Amino acid sequence: MSGISKLSDFWVEKYKKESKKSWDKFYKRNETRFFKDRHWLDREFDCYFGLPDKLPLTILEVGCGVGNLVYPLLEVQPNLKIYCCDFSPRAIDFVKKHSCYNENRVFPFVNDITEDSLLEVLGSACIDTLTAIFVLSAIPREKQLRSIKNLASVIKPGGHLVFRDYCDGDFAQEKFMTSGDPSMIDEQTFVRQDGTLSLFFREEDIAEWMKSAGFGLVTLDRVNRTVDNRKRNLNMKRTFLQGVWKKL
């Protein structure tokens, strides 16, 4: 724990309260340039998105950002109907401005999953597969269970939630812990310089929250990657959690 400066209660509450504003500023500053398109999702989770000759599936992506997952997925799965939400209005605007936007296939909307009912928007449990890719880590620990229950409310019985996010022990967490800057909310949650939150999950925590929300575990694994940063002469050992749960 040496080298870590914990934030005061005042700043912890301020960063949590202004999280939505911080993400909207992030998209104002970076527009569509920051995140790469996620072309790996259909490879990692292909059986949860169906094949082109199967019946259409209804997908919900939470924390969709500017559409880096939505549009690559539509390219390879033409029968999908995708709802997507983000709590940044600016991000949703970028989704709608995308050159491949089709209002008959893509249905973007603003939603804060920690507070806003998804069921009120969708009207029923109509989702076959829900994706939560690097989104729950932006939510404080105390709001995790409520948020996951919100996700569960719109998934069909037998439908699936697919998940990938930051894991305890990741290089980025170690960087936070040795930076010397006052950025720590707790041992697993930190504040980036732009004011956004980053929670590093432990397997037992996410497994318990999912179970309490009415999901049965299909698979949960650590994914280890080594990323070379040649400019900074760094070998970064990235560690993510990747899992699938079934709505009971």
From Swiss-Prot:
Tell me which GO cellular component terms the UniProt record holds: cytosol; nucleus
Q: Where does S-adenosyl-L-methionine bind?
A: 23, 27, 63, 86, 112, 133
What Enzyme Commission number does this protein have? 2.1.1.-
Major location (coarse)? cytoplasm
Q: Which UniProt keywords apply?
A: Cytoplasm, Methyltransferase, Nucleus, Transferase, tRNA processing
Q: What reaction does this enzyme carry out catalytically?
A: cytidine(32) in tRNA(Ser) + S-adenosyl-L-methionine = N(3)-methylcytidine(32) in tRNA(Ser) + S-adenosyl-L-homocysteine + H(+)
Work out whether the entry's keyword set contains Protein biosynthesis: no
The entry assigns this protein to a family as follows: Belongs to the methyltransferase superfamily. METL family.
Its name, as the record gives it, is tRNA N(3)-methylcytidine methyltransferase trm141
Lineage of the organism: Eukaryota, Fungi, Dikarya, Ascomycota, Taphrinomycotina
